[in-house]
Amino acid sequence: MKVIHTIKDLQAELTALRAQGKKVGLVPTMGALHAGHASLVKRSVSENGVTVVSVFVNPTQFNDKNDLAKYPRTLDADCRLLEDCGAAFAFAPSVEEMYPQPDTREFSYAPLDTVMEGAFRPGHFNGVCQIVSKLFDAVQPDRAYFGEKDFQQLAIIREMVRQMDYKLEIVGCPIVREEDGLALSSRNKRLSARERENALNISQTLFKSRTFAASHTVSETQKMVEEAIEDAPGLRLEYFEIVDGNTLQKVSSWEDSLYVVGCITVFCGEVRLIDNIKYKEI
């Protein structure tokens, strides 16, 4: 595996490989890689002749400078994981490489980007779309892989691809969890042992809510989750929404949509964790 730091060098490598007829898969990441990322990389390796994994902590998607400063940076360990997964290239550019000038582009995909994360993290999805579009332009992948844990992000990127007419396939990949159910996240590294134990209440509550939902209304299920998280030690609920999986708009009845997802964000101590669960899926 090669580690590449400039767009020019990456494009030179990819041009030669495309001339051999190879398809290119892209896995955008911010590093601090774990088994969830590995599942995306392995999927790409299985479906493409060449896999590029970007490792870049994108400053424009952080609306909290403290969160940006604390985000784990572990490039050497990341490269070892990527090599083990069969990636061809780790693309680890500098901020100056990706943003030689400030990016003033405004991306708006309302109502997808105005609810949930969009409401609580203003500017976040604009930053996500800035960097993802830059990566798409630099790599020109045939397929790009994103995890379903960032459910809203995946929906917004699909819409960006549709509106900007990118000629690529977006592949959503299932959430990867620890054996005890905790959704894998780079931020889990910041949890103390006690906080990690408390964080288990998030996934456990979501799993219970899926069973609960089979015999209760949407509003009853919403209340059950909110009360369970509020009663759990060391957790502070930011939001829990039960939404249409395509439009991300709230549903009031299970009959409102064939695709219904519960999306949650919880603070465990100072660490902000997200998760989701599918109640109905086509």
UniProtKB/Swiss-Prot annotation:
It is found in: Cytoplasm. (R)-pantoate binds at residues 61, 153. Gene3D superfamilies: HUPs (3.40.50.620), Pantoate-beta-alanine ligase, C-terminal domain (3.30.1300.10). InterPro entries: Pantoate_ligase, Pantoate_ligase_C, Rossmann-like_a/b/a_fold. One of its GO terms (molecular function) is pantoate-beta-alanine ligase activity. Its EC number is 6.3.2.1. Beta-alanine binds at residue 61. It is an enzyme of class 6 (ligase). GO terms for cellular component: cytosol. The keyword Nucleotide-binding applies. Pathway: Cofactor biosynthesis; (R)-pantothenate biosynthesis; (R)-pantothenate from (R)-pantoate and beta-alanine: step 1/1. It catalyses: (R)-pantoate + beta-alanine + ATP = (R)-pantothenate + AMP + diphosphate + H(+). The active site is at 37 (proton donor). It holds the Pfam family Pantoate_ligase. GO terms for biological process: pantothenate biosynthetic process. Its main location: cytoplasm. Keywords: ATP-binding, Cytoplasm, Ligase, Nucleotide-binding, Pantothenate biosynthesis. Signal peptide: none annotated. ATP binds at residues 30-37, 147-150, 176, 184-187. The keyword ATP-binding applies. The reaction proceeds by a bi uni uni bi ping pong mechanism. Catalyzes the condensation of pantoate with beta-alanine in an ATP-dependent reaction via a pantoyl-adenylate intermediate. Belongs to the pantothenate synthetase family. This is Pantothenate synthetase.
